[in-house]
Structures are given as C-alpha cells and as structure tokens.
Amino acid sequence: MPDGPLIVQSDRSVLLEVAHPHAADARHDLAVFAELERAPEHIHTYRITRLGLWNARAAGHTAEEILGTLEKYSKYAVPASVTIDIAETVNRYGRLTIERDAEGTLILRGTDAAVLSEVSRSKKVSTLLEGKREDGSYEVAAWARGQLKQELLKLGWPAEDNAGYKPGAHHDIDLATDGWALRHYQEKAVSNFLEGGSGVVVLPCGAGKTLVGAGAMAATKTDTLILVTNTVSARQWRDELLKRTSLTPDEIGEYSGATKEIKPVTIATYQILTAKRGGEFAHLALLDALDWGLVIYDEVHLLPAPVFKLTAELQARRRLGLTATLVREDGRESDVFSLIGPKRFDAPWKEIEQEGFISPAECKEIRIDLDPEERLIYAAASDAERYRLAATSPVKIAIAKKLIAAHPGERVLVIGQYLDQL
C-alpha cells in the first residue's frame, strides 16, 4: 500500500497532507472531480460531490480514472462504499439524453427503460412531457428543455443534452493573431466547448478567459450576447475584442444602465438584465433583439439567481460560461450545470503557473487572537454576529498595515467583505 498524501473517508471527504512530497501532484489530479472545502496550514479538506463527479464525467473523465487517482495517492485503502458510490454516480451521467428528431421535436431517451420509467413518474417531470412514443421515449414540451434538465438533475439522473442549437445570424469574426496566438490550453478550452455544444470553462484569474470567449466567437462566427458583472468588465471586454479580433467599434454595442446599444456583438451587464419595472423584467427584449447564436456568461459563479430563469429560456442557443470557480455562495451550482452546461475544460492554476502564463503565487495564512474585550463580546454573540466580529477585528487592520509597510513601492490590493472595514 503506497504511503500517499491522501486519506479518503467514508463520508466522501478527502484529506490532503500538504507537506507530503507528492501533495502537489495529488492536488492537481484531485481538482478534476473534488472541491476544496478548507485549506488550513497542514491539512486541506476536499469534498467529492455528485455534481463534481458529473462535471468530471462531462469533461471526459471516467470512473476508472477517478478511482485510479484516489488509489494512487491514498495513504490507506479507499473505503469500499466510496468506490461503489463513485462508480454508480459517475455512470448515471448520460443514461438519459435529450435529442431532437427529424421534425424538430424534443425527445427524452434513455439507455435503461427502468430509469426512463422512473423519472417519467415524477410529478414535476411528467408536466414537462407531452406523451410516450412507441419506442419508449418521451416527447418534451418545446419550452421545457431547461426545466427538464433541472428536474432530472434533482432526481439524480443528469441528462446529456444532444438536441443541438440554433446557428444564429452569421457574423464574420476572426482572431487578429498578428504577433500572438491562443495558448495551448485556451485552444483546448475552445475545442472542448465546441465539441460539447454548451458548458463552462474554468480557468484561474489572469489565465485569459476573455480570449477563450473571443476564440469561441471566432469559431462560431455568429451574433453574440456577452453578459458581464458590471460596466467596467463590459468596457474591458470591448477593448480586448477590438484588440484581439477583427471586430470594429461599430460592431460592438454596450447595453447597460448608461447605454442601450444593440449590435451584432452586444455586451450587457447582469444588473440591467435583472432590472424590473412594474414587477416585470424591463429588458427581456434584449434576449430576442437579434438572432444570437452564442451567449457568453462571464464570471458565471456570480450569475444572479433571476438570470437562471431567463437562461432556462435560452436553451436553443450555445452557452459558454467562464469562471475561476464553480462554487457559488448561494449553492446553486446545480443550476449552472443544468442551464449553462457542465464543465467542459478545467486547467489547474499550478500547471499554468509552472508554464509561466500566470505569476507565481505565495499564499500565507495569518491567524489572529481577539483581545480580552472582543472575546467577551464574541462569546455572547449569535453565530451570525460572531462571523462579522471575527472578520472585522481591529487586529486585522494593524497586521494589514504591517504587511503593506513591508512592501514599499509595490502595488497592493486589499480585498475584504465589509465596506466600513475597508
């Protein structure tokens, strides 16, 4: 039995011994299917979830590969219950498929008649189906493609969407590769996205997610709607597209609080899309303003919840999500999987760092002690109040000042959650 850096526990948590000589390799392979939960100094905790396994399967990884990783790096034998659970979970992906027949009707098919029968008896699923065919498949309501995927995922049977997409209005877009080219991982991300039809590309900050979007636009050559977090991001996207593609200023529009332009490539903010007037979304017309062939969601982990409902109605368009993490604060990762698409590509930051594409990062954790007066207040506080008290401790300000003073003349970015503290 190899003395590896991992301890796999029966609750599907995985402990990584950071000081182990093979820890970096194990972390790289583990990131394919497990999410980092906690990262204190010596032991990192990962969690293997059903969604993580299905994302890995959608990206082309098999149950055998996943189990092979755990067995290769585990300090002890992987619990039999975990082995069985992983194999069964991974093999659930793709047992159901959504397809389109020659007449354009959406069809729900299954490789296992028992599974198809099981899900069709679900009350919520049955309302989305329009009848059973002679071959045992089911016709799906034209408007229900997104909702059906959501409901099937909740039942534990994620459907593979092979129903295809509207090509959208043709628009010539080429990469202006004079003196530069997409990096190998960016090319792979674009290739995987096109092969899968829709889905999410996960790249670390600074790795060039915008260029992946530009590459997808050049490959699809269609009217494109780009949704971003704010107007600053919108203008960054515009500048990058003008620099890296054949697009001209007249072909790119900004649709935000200040400007309402609709062009073959339109960049809109999430805020404007979710703005309401009289209780109704005021800018829904943007979704049908042009025959979009591609919709890009920048920083998809920040996608506002109301946009999910709108995205459910965009299932006939190619959708590309860009993000540095699939983890959302509201826990709606399953909606990203169902409505944007599964993970199509994931490049670990360490790998890109080693190749020199992003600056090396040195991470340090500094723990502080509350002073006696703060400890008394903390002890009497509720859980919610405790979080804020710990987060805004004045001791942190003193330490931050020391750290800044230790880096004179350097550019320093301080990130925090509470504005009054910043």
Residue ranges, per PLM feature:
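Conserved helix-turn-beta segment of the N-terminal RecA-like "Helicase ATP-binding" lobe
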Residues: 231-258
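Conserved pre-motif I regulatory segment
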Residues: 167-202
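Post-DEXD/H (motif II) to motif III coupling segment of the RecA-like Helicase ATP-binding lobe
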Residues: 293-294, 299-364
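Hydrophobic anchor at the beta1->P-loop junction of P-loop NTPases
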Residues: 201-203, 226, 414
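Walker A/P-loop
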Residues: 196-217
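Conserved interdomain hinge at the start of the Helicase C-terminal
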Residues: 377-421
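Extended alpha-helical interface modules used as scaffolds for assembling large macromolecular complexes
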Residues: 1-168
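Conserved helix/coil segment N-terminal to the catalytic DExD/H
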Residues: 256-294, 302-310
